[in-house]
C-alpha cells in the first residue's frame, strides 16, 4: 500500500553551492537542489496519518477532500450493499481498487520516471512561475493556496526552491491515491469476509491478525527510519544531506516496504478465507514489485550507484573456468528447469534422463501414493546422509579430495564430480517430492483453493530464496566450494551480501518453505507432514553439525550477525530466550560431534607403546624348556627391530642327536601362528630356508640364504639369512621357527622381532624419487626407472603404496600406480603436487 524508499546516503556539499539565507538551522538536515546545488533547510513535515487525521494540524484543501473521499467511500459502500447487495458492491469496489492501484503503480510510476530523468514537474513549475506572487493565474494561485493552507504561518514560499514546493504538492496527490487505494481494498475485503469467520476459521483469523499487526509494525518502523523525505520519494526532487540509520525493519528484509510490508494483504486474505481476495492481493503485490523494478531501482542506481558488490565467489568461478580447460559451469536444477546445461557433458544427460524416467514411470505405471511416499522418504534419507557424510569427512580429513588425488585426478576434478553428485541428489529427491505431492493432491476429496494458493506462495518463496542464495554466494558457494577448494579463497571473511545481510542461514528454514507449501497444497496430508519435517530436520542437522563447524574452521569463530538477529535481539525477552537455546544447542552439537573417548580415565596409547606391548606378550610365549645347549638367536641377540627388506640373520645351535639334514627354518607372523608352540599349523608361503646347502636340492630355495653351516663334535650350528627374496613386506611382529626334519614339528622359536618400513625422505620430488629408486634397487625390483612388480613374488604394488604413504603422508591408489607404470620420477612429482594441494586446503 505505502511504499519504501532507500534511505539517502550522506552527501557532503560541494564547492560553489548557493546558500539561501535565513533558512538553515544546525539542528535540521541540509538539502540542495538537483540542478544548481542551491542549499536550503527543509521545512518540517508530518506523515500522512497525522497530516490527515490529527486535528491539531492545519489541513489543506486537498487534505480535506481526501478525508471526505474516505468517508464517502464508506457511506457509499453501506448504501450500495443495502440497495444492490454485497456481491455487486464487492465488484464495484474491486474495480475501484484496480483503478487506484493502477494510478499508484502506473500513474505515480510514470510521473516519477519523468521527474527522475528530466525533472519534468520541477521544470513545469519554474517555466510557469507557479510559486511567484506575481503570477495570478488560477493554477499558480491554487498551488500557492494549497501549500500555504497546509504549512505553518511562518512558511514563506519564495524562500524555498521550486523543487521543495513541487514536492509538497506532489505529496498531496500521493496521499489521495494511496488513501483511496487502501480504503477501496479494505472495503472489498470486508465485503468478502463471511459472517461466521470467528467460529469457522479461528486459526486463520488468529494468523491473519498477527500478520496485520506485523504489517503495522513494518510501516511504523520504516517511517521511523526513513522519515518523510524517503517516504515520499524526496530524492526524485532534491538531495538531502542526512545520515540515516539502517536498523529495525530494514535489517529484516530486502525492500521491506515492498516485501514484508504487504504481509497485511495476506493476513486479510486468511481472515476472509476467499481465494479471490488472495488472488487480488497477489495481483496488487505484484504490481508493487513491478513499480520497484521499473521506477525505483533505476533511479536508485542512477543517484546512489548500484548495490552490487564484487563477489569473491564469482571471481573463483571465473578463475576455475579460465585455469581449467576441462572445467565448465555445473548443471544446476532450478525449480522445474535446468541451467548451465552442457551438451557435451554426459552427466547432464544422465541427470535429465533420470528425472524423465521417474516422471514417465509415475505417469504410466501409476504407483500408489503410499509407494511414492516411501520412495521419496528413502531417497531423501539416503541423499541427505550421503551429502552430510561426504561434507563431514571432507571437512575433517579432506577425504573426497584425497580419494581423487590418489587416483591421479586433480583437486578441481574432485570438485567437478562433487557438483554432479550434489545436484543429482537434490534433483532426485525433489522430483520424487513433487510427484508424491501431485499424487496426493489428485486424490483429495475437497480442495481449499485459498490454502492451495498459499502453498504455491511458499513454493515460490523457496524458489526465490534459492535464487537469492545463488546470487549472493555464486556457484562456488552453492556447491560448498569452501569445503573442496579452500586454497581458492582469497578473503577469509563471511559473505554478508544479498540475502545473507538479513539471514545468516536462509536455507535453514526458507530453503524448505516449498516442502511446507506441499503440506498446504495436500490439505495437511500425514505423508507430506512427515516429509516436510524430514526435510527441515535434515537441513537443520546439515547446518548445525557440518556447515557451522566447518565455517568456524575456515573463516574463524567470529559469528556473522544477520539483520533479523540484530533486530530480534533488541527485544530483551527474545534475547534471553535465545541465549538459553544457544547454550542447549552448543551442548548437543558438542556431544554429537565429539570424538573423545567416553571414559575420561582411559588415556590414549601411542603406537610405539602398543608395539612394545605386543613384543613383550610374544616374548612370554616363546618356548623356554629347551636343553641348555640349544641356541636360536637373531643377529647379536640385542636387536628386536629390523628394517624391511632386512636381511634378518638367525644363528642356531643344536646337539647332533637332534639335528636332521632336512631341518628348516620358516618366517611367520606371531599372531598367525597362534598359541601352539609345539607345531606350526600355518603355511610359510615360501618364506623358509634349509639349514645346509645340501638339503632340499630341488626346492628352488636360494643357496645364499645359508650363510654358515658347521659340525663341531656333539653340536651342529649355522647361520641363515632372510633377505629380500624371503622377506615379508609388511610391518608387524614376526618370529622364526626351527622345524625338525621335513615336518612342522617345532624345535626352537626365535625371539619375536618387529619389521618396519624403511625411512624414505620426501621433502622434495627428487628426494622421494631417489629414495624409492634406492630401495627398489636393494630388493632387485627396479626396471629402468620403474618398479617391476613381477620381480619379487612377495613385493607387490600395495607395499609400494604403503611405503609412499608412510614417507610422504600421501595416499596413491594402486590403480594410479599401475597407470603410470610405477615410474618413481612421476610418483615423486605427483606426491609433491598432492602435498601442495592438501597444505593449501588447511
Curated annotation (Swiss-Prot):
Ranges annotated as biased composition (Basic residues): 8-18
Enzymatic reactions: a 1,2-diacyl-sn-glycero-3-phosphoethanolamine + S-adenosyl-L-methionine = a 1,2-diacyl-sn-glycero-3-phospho-N-methylethanolamine + S-adenosyl-L-homocysteine + H(+)
Top-level EC class as recorded in UniProt: transferase
Pathway given in the UniProt record: Phospholipid metabolism; phosphatidylcholine biosynthesis
Membrane topology: Multi-pass membrane protein
Pfam family, one: PEMT
Broad class of the protein's primary localization: endoplasmic reticulum
A GO biological process held by the record: phosphatidylcholine biosynthetic process
TM helices/strands, residue ranges: 61-81, 92-112, 173-193, 197-217, 244-264, 271-291, 346-366, 371-391, 415-435, 469-489, 515-535
Residue numbers on the Lumenal membrane side: 1-60, 113-172, 218-243, 292-345, 392-414, 490-514
Stretches of the chain found on the membrane's Cytoplasmic side: 82-91, 194-196, 265-270, 367-370, 436-468, 536-842
Enzyme Commission code(s) on record: 2.1.1.17
Domain of life of the organism encoding this protein: Eukaryota
Cellular compartment(s): Endoplasmic reticulum membrane
A Gene Ontology cellular-component term: endoplasmic reticulum membrane
Keywords on record: Endoplasmic reticulum, Lipid biosynthesis, Lipid metabolism, Membrane, Methyltransferase, Phospholipid biosynthesis, Phospholipid metabolism, S-adenosyl-L-methionine, Transferase, Transmembrane, Transmembrane helix
Function comment: Catalyzes the first step of the methylation pathway of phosphatidylcholine biosynthesis, the SAM-dependent methylation of phosphatidylethanolamine (PE) to phosphatidylmonomethylethanolamine (PMME).
Annotated family: Belongs to the class VI-like SAM-binding methyltransferase superfamily. CHO2 family.
Protein name per the record: Phosphatidylethanolamine N-methyltransferase
Amino acid at each position: 500500500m505505502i511504499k519504501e524508499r532507500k534511505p539517502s546516503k550522506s552527501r557532503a556539499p560541494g564547492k560553489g553551492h548557493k546558500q539561501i539565507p535565513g533558512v538553515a538551522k544546525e539542528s535540521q538536515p541540509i538539502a540542495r537542489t538537483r540542478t544548481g546545488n542551491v542549499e536550503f533547510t527543509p521545512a518540517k513535515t508530518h506523515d500522512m496519518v497525522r497530516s490527515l487525521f490529527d486535528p491539531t494540524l492545519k489541513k489543506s484543501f486537498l487534505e480535506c477532500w481526501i478525508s471526505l473521499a474516505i468517508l464517502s467511500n464508506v457511506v457509499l459502500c453501506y448504501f450500495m450493499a443495502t440497495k444492490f447487495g454485497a456481491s455487486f458492491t464487492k465488484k464495484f469496489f474491486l474495480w475501484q481498487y484496480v483503478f487506484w492501484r493502477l494510478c499508484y503503480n502506473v500513474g505515480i510510476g510514470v510521473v516519477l520516471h519523468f521527474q527522475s530523468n528530466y525533472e519534468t514537474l520541477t521544470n513545469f513549475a519554474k517555466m510557469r512561475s507557479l510559486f511567484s506572487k506575481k503570477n495570478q493565474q488560477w493554477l499558480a494561485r491554487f498551488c500557492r493556496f494549497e501549500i500555504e493552507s497546509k504549512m505553518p504561518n511562518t512558511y514563506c514560499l519564495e524562500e524555498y526552491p521550486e523543487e521543495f514546493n513541487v514536492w509538497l504538492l506532489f505529496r498531496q496527490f500521493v496521499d489521495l491515491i494511496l488513501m483511496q487505494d487502501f480504503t477501496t481494498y479494505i472495503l472489498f475485503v470486508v465485503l468478502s469476509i463471511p459472517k461466521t469467520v470467528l467460529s469457522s476459521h479461528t486459526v486463520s483469523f488468529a494468523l491473519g491478525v498477527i500478520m496485520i499487526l506485523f504489517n503495522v509494525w513494518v510501516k511504523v518502523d520504516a517511517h521511523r527510519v526513513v522519515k518523510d523525505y524517503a517516504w515520499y520519494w524526496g530524492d526524485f526532487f532534491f538531495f538531502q544531506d542526512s545520515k540515516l540509520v539502517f536498523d529495525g525493519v530494514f535489517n529484516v528484509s530486502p525492500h521491506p516496504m515492498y516485501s514484508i510490508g504487504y504481509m497485511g494483504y495476506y493476513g486479510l486474505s486468511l481472515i476472509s478465507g476467499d481465494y479471490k481476495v488472495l488472488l487480488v492481493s497477489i495481483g496488487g503485490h505484484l504490481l508493487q514489485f513491478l513499480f520497484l523494478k521499473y521506477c525505483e531501482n533505476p533511479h536508485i542506481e542512477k543517484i546512489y550507484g548500484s548495490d552490487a558488490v564484487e563477489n569473491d565467489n564469482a571471481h573463483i568461478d571465473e578463475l576455475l573456468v579460465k585455469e581449467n580447460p576441462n572445467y565448465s559451469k555445473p548443471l544446476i536444477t532450478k525449480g522445474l528447469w535446468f541451467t548451465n546445461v552442457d551438451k557435451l557433458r554426459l552427466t547432464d544427460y544422465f541427470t535429465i534422463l533420470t528425472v524423465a524416467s521417474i516422471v514417465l514411470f509415475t505417469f504410466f505405471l501409476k504407483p500408489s501414493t503410499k509407494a511414492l511416499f516411501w520412495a521419496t522418504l528413502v531417497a531423501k534419507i539416503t541423499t541427505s546422509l550421503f551429502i552430510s557424510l561426504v561434507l563431514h569427512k571432507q571437512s575433517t580429513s579432506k577425504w573426497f579430495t584425497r580419494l581423487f588425488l590418489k587416483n591421479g585426478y586433480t583437486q578441481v576434478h574432485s570438485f567437478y564430480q562433487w557438483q554432479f553428485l550434489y545436484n543429482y541428489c537434490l534433483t532426485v529427491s525433489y522430483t520424487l517430492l513433487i510427484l508424491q505431492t501431485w499424487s496426493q493432491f489428485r486424490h483429495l476429496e475437497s480442495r481449499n483453493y485459498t490454502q492451495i494458493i498459499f502453498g504455491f506462495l511458499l513454493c515460490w518463496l523457496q524458489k526465490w530464496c534459492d535464487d537469492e542464495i545463488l546470487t549472493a554466494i555464486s556457484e562456488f558457494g552453492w556447491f560448498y566450494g569452501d569445503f573442496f577448494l579452500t586454497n581458492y579463497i582469497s578473503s577469509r571473511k563471511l559473505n554478508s551480501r544479498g540475502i545473507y545481510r538479513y539471514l545468516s542461514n536462509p536455507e535453514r528454514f526458507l530453503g524448505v518453505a516449498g516442502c511446507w507449501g506441499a503440506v498446504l497444497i495436500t490439505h495437511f496430508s500425514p505423508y507430506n507432514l512427515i516429509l516436510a519435517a524430514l526435510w527441515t530436520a535434515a537441513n537443520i542437522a546439515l547446518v548445525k553439525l557440518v556447515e557451522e563447524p566447518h565455517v568456524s574452521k575456515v573463516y574463524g569463530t567470529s559469528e556473522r550477525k544477520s539483520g533479523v538477529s540484530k533486530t530480534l535481539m533488541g527485544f530483551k525477552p527474545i534475547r534471553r530466550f535465545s541465549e538459553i537455546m544457544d547454550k542447549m544447542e552448543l551442548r548437543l552439537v558438542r556431544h554429537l560431534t565429539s570424538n573423545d573417548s567416553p571414559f575420561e580415565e582411559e588415556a590414549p596409547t601411542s603406537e610405539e607403546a602398543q608395539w612394545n606391548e605386543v613384543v613383550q606378550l610374544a616374548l612370554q610365549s616363546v618356548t623356554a624348556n629347551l636343553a641348555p645347549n640349544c641356541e636360536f638367536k637373531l643377529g647379536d641377540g640385542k636387536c628386536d627391530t629390523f628394517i624391511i627388506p632386512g636381511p634378518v640373520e638367525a644363528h642356531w645351535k643344536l646337539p647332533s642327536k637332534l639335528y636332521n639334514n632336512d631341518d628348516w627354518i620358516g618366517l611367520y607372523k606371531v599372531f598367525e601362528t597362534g598359541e601352539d608352540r609345539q607345531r606350526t599349523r600355518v603355511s610359510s608361503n615360501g618364506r623358509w630356508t634349509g639349514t645346509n646347502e645340501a638339503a632340499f636340492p630341488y626346492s628352488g630355495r636360494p643357496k645364499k640364504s645359508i650363510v654358515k653351516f658347521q659340525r663341531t663334535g656333539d653340536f651342529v650350528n649355522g647361520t641363515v639369512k632372510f633377505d629380500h627374496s624371503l622377506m615379508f613386506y609388511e610391518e608387524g611382529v614376526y618370529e622364526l621357527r626351527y622345524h625338525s626334519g621335513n615336518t612342522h614339528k617345532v624345535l626352537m622359536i626365535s625371539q619375536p622381532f618387529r619389521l618396519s618400513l624403511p625411512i624414505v625422505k620426501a621433502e622434495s620430488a627428487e628426494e622421494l624419487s631417489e629414495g624409492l629408486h634406492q630401495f627398489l634397487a636393494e630388493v632387485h625390483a627396479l626396471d629402468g626407472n620403474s618398479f617391476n612388480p613381477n620381480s619379487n613374488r612377495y613385493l607387490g604394488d600395495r607395499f609400494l603404496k604403503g611405503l609412499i604413504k608412510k614417507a610422504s603422508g600421501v595416499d596413491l591408489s594402486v590403480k594410479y600406480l599401475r597407470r603410470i607404470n610405477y615410474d618413481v620420477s612421476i610418483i615423486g612429482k605427483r606426491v609433491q603436487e598432492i602435498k601442495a594441494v592438501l597444505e593449501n586446503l588447511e
